[in-house]
Amino acid sequence: MSFIEKLKNAWVSNNSLLCIGLDPDTEKFPDLFKTMAKPEAVFAFNKAIIDATHDLVCAYKPQIAYFSAEAAETSLEQTIAYIKTQYPHIPVILDAKRGDIGSTAQKYAAEAFERYQADAVTVNPYLGLDSITPFTAYRERGTILLCRTSNSGAADLQDLSVDGIPLYQKVAITARDHWNSHNNCLLVVGATWPEQMAAIRQLVGDMPFLVPGVGAQGGDVNAMVKAGKTADGNGLIISSSRAVLYASNGDDFAQAARAVALSLRQQINVARA
């Protein structure tokens, strides 16, 4: 089953557009993990979060830097393998934001799709087509291109005018017309920019969006969903990380994470009704 098919099924089966970002920061872990080696703690923490929320999400999104910074790449492999074994209907997005020349991009694609067995990966399109093709060549996997990101500095480059339109719109149009020949491209569009999201939706039709910026970054759920949803009420992978993962630093952290995830899913579903 392709990533896009898996995603569409998860939207329906879990009645959810919510994605939980797995950004394991060991300094924020509850005390019960403090006696473990960091890689062991990372996997144990992720496992508890996944077990508590698997029926509430349309995807999980591990951020690779949080694993590599702790020398916990093995924990990343374990985390993805656990999801695929226990909850195989839930797709996994590797948040790596890779971007390099073609030969190196081939290795980054192999890392994401062969080593880690991710269903999709985030990619920086700044280097153009030859840096993207090695990812989209994996036709059953998803390539998620940075378009209008959620951070405060996004406008520094993304709003620059290119051929009379903002650069982020140029990226969206180029993805639509030239990079999506296998229908496996998606776009990163931040929740913090609903007006820009609406403009991108008009440009790319039903192409799915990965939407960071909900929760700790302060994106407005109602405005974002109304701006970005497709005609069928889907089309979005709305990611929240810190607000869910660190809802509690006590032994009830997993239950607290579930409560926040349940609330977020409900907010999203009300907005898309």
Curated annotation (Swiss-Prot):
Tell me its EC number(s), please. Answer: 4.1.1.23
Alphabetically list the UniProt keywords: Decarboxylase, Lyase, Pyrimidine biosynthesis
One Gene Ontology term of the molecular function aspect = orotidine-5'-phosphate decarboxylase activity
- Record's InterPro entries? Aldolase_TIM, OMPdecase_AS, OMPdecase_type-2, OMPdeCOase_dom, RibuloseP-bd_barrel
Name-wise, this protein is Orotidine 5'-phosphate decarboxylase
UniProt key word Lyase = yes
**GO BP annotation list:** 'de novo' pyrimidine nucleobase biosynthetic process; 'de novo' UMP biosynthetic process
Enumerate the catalysed reactions. orotidine 5'-phosphate + H(+) = UMP + CO2
Protein's gene: pyrF
**Main EC class the enzyme belongs to:** lyase
Query: Family assignment?
Result: Belongs to the OMP decarboxylase family. Type 2 subfamily.
Q: Does the keyword Membrane apply?
A: no
Active site per database record: 97
UniProt pathway: Pyrimidine metabolism; UMP biosynthesis via de novo pathway; UMP from orotate: step 2/2
